[in-house]
Amino acid sequence: VIAGGTDVASARFLSPRQARDLPRARIACYPSSTIGTRYPDPFHLGSHSYGFNPWEHNGIVYTCRGGHIDISHLRKACDWTAYLAWHIRQALLSDKATFSYRMREPSKHYLQFEYPQGWASLPPDVRERIAADIAIQVAAYCTYMGMVWHEILTWFGYKAVAFYTEYPSAFSWEDVYSNLLGCRLAVEALRDPDRDFDEALTARIDEELQRLGVQPKPAAWQAGQAVRGQWFVGDFLFCDIVKRNFDIGWDDGFVTPWIVPGTGGCSDASPAIYAVPSLSALREYGFSVKYEIEPREWERKEILSILYPPGRGQTRRIEPAQHFGAIMQYVRAQAIHRYGTYVDDPTLPSPVAPQLAVVKPAGTETAVAQSPVATGASLGMQSQAAREETRSGRYGYEGVEPASGGAGRGQKLTTNDVLTFAYFWLGEEP
């Protein structure tokens, strides 16, 4: 039986021309107060653009309820959600059983669909509506998991650019929350019946930052400086994040941002806790989707060895809902070995950093349970009290490769990528 669901008949997807191109590259930066970190005016971030736009500003901003937010990460998550939503909708309307794609790493992502009985006989307008709703939900889920996968890869040493490792910033304290926020805002923008994706997203980013209590430009640097020697050490090429945020929502389906206490203008505001995307809502339509990742990076051997016996896992796939928990436990154990027991606790000093003032608790308590990522939690903001009620314990360089049901072609830099890198090196931000 096919029933229910949000009416998304008027949803505004990317245009076919936009969807031909991969989401463009954007330069991210550390949240730390180090050389190279860009701080845009959070009240004038410019218009979001799926394609190249010299008036779009990115960098680190600080919010009272969301802590540091990387606008580049947020925008990338938005664009990947929109890109995947367009292609997944096309696959569903073509009755394809499988769909595959690549993000910004060699890994290949697979989706396997099971359709409900009677799907082929539904009126075209009903199929369109259901396909649109499912595509948006699945795209947000896959984008979020793909972004987490990128953090996992960089933790194990993956380099998107030769000789430049992203390990120092893997699971830095703002990464996951920024990605999650982007997925959420993309869902809302895609469902906007009156504006195209770029226009709707421009408005939603500004509105959400205001709701999170975004602070003037200097506050982002000041908040980073406040945790120098506690959450990070060093500077520029020698910066190391000694506090890592491994909260991907595996324990309870929610992600809590790290808040820097005492930041001017915030008055000890409580963190805005968000639910991670899930696939649970597909059941109301009678659909099911299996999502897998096939690692193709050099680092795959070590990652797969966590899940499979030696010599047996080199061609295996990873199912995030089933395997990310074990991988994250392994990553956390490595982090504890390298940085100390409290590596993921922002309230206590790191033993490998200078012993400065201790950052006080700010609602970032941690608790180990089966992941609701598998069982599902709907997109939505929850209060601290609501989250406590659900807690039961603690705890994405390339192109899109065509395959069965796949989209895109080749591993290459797009014109948008070249323009983005050139503009950055010419000086995007003052």
Predicted segments, located by residue:
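A glycine-rich, coil/turn loop motif that links secondary-structure elements
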Residues: 168-174
